Amino acid sequence: MEFSVSQQIELVKNEVKDFINHKHLTVVPKVHYETVVNIGTSIICTKYGIGYPGGSFVQSVVNNDLMRTFSTADATNRQYIDLYCKMLYNIPNP
């Protein structure tokens, strides 16, 4: 059975939430939780070509471009670059 793009994105989003909630030591406060889930989902979807590619920050994380990652990250995302990198290498293609 083949999943639609929206179903694939929802699968990735659930994997990202599971990773944040159960598989990583970084505590994401409620105030940042939705942002981190959305950016993490965009990173994984961009990596696997699901839907449309993410913006400049997401592209720089996926492309392993450290300087661009830090220069395009806002204050919130800068705190979670380590988490995003761990997601990138530990969340499989849905």
What are these regions (language model features)?
Residues 70-94:
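Amphipathic alpha-helical binding modules
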Residues 7-10, 34, 59, 79:
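Residue-identity detector for glutamine
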Residues 5-17, 64:
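Extracytoplasmic/secretory-pathway segments with low complexity and glycosylation-like composition
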Residues 16, 43, 81-84:
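Generic structural hydrophobic/aromatic packing signal, biased to beta-strands
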Residues 20-72:
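Amphipathic alpha-helical interaction modules
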